[in-house]
């Protein structure tokens, strides 16, 4: 396991699940409007201004996780999408549901660019897929994440 990721997980009370969910929501908003990565940063700035109540529920480490994830996803947006496209067999990226795309973007960023353990990411992303997607979302997302993991080895 990546030592920095483990430290970040331990420091955040209750882990980073809440922050990860908020990252997903921001990415979902950008994907739903088919915006560019630059708009992810703008959406994040607006989010920070309008979400004082939620921001108050995040501890310092969760907020840092949220900020660094948004920055990292915005910087690597095109690369992340390319990785997902290469690992979706017989699926055009545009045909993937917005919920599933957003979840895959968050998971791919953490796994590839932060070297976070796939087991941790997959478990939380699958839970989010069950909560926000349809009854097949988690299976689809899990399959693509398995392909991404294989391609990284």
From Swiss-Prot:
Listed GO biological process terms: DNA-templated transcription termination; transcription antitermination
Keyword Transcription regulation: yes
Gene3D superfamilies for this protein: NusB-like
Keywords, ordered alphabetically: RNA-binding, Transcription, Transcription antitermination, Transcription regulation
Top-level division of the source organism's lineage: Bacteria
A single cellular component GO annotation: cytosol
Gene Ontology terms for molecular function: RNA binding
HAMAP family xrefs: NusB (MF_00073)
Family under the similarity heading: Belongs to the NusB family.
Function: Involved in transcription antitermination. Required for transcription of ribosomal RNA (rRNA) genes. Binds specifically to the boxA antiterminator sequence of the ribosomal RNA (rrn) operons.
Name of this protein: Transcription antitermination protein NusB
Provenance organism: Fusobacterium nucleatum subsp. nucleatum (strain ATCC 25586 / DSM 15643 / BCRC 10681 / CIP 101130 / JCM 8532 / KCTC 2640 / LMG 13131 / VPI 4355)
């Amino acid at each position: 396991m990546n030592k920095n990721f483990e430290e970040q997980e331990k420091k955040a009370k209750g882990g980073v699940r809440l922050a990860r969910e908020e990252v997903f929501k921001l990415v979902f908003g950008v994907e739903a409007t088919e915006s560019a990565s630059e708009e992810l940063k703008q959406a994040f700035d607006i989010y920070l201004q309008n979400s004082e109540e939620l921001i108050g529920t995040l501890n310092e480490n969760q907020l840092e996780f949220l900020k660094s994830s948004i920055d990292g996803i915005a910087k690597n947006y095109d690369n992340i999408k390319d990785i997902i496209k290469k690992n979706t067999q017989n699926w055009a990226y545009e045909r993937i549901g917005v919920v599933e795309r957003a979840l895959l973007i968050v998971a791919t960023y953490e796994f590839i660019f932060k070297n976070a353990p796939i087991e941790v990411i997959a478990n939380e992303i699958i839970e989010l897929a069950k909560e926000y997607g349809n009854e097949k979302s988690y299976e689809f997302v899990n399959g693509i994440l398995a392909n991404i993991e294989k391609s990284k080895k």
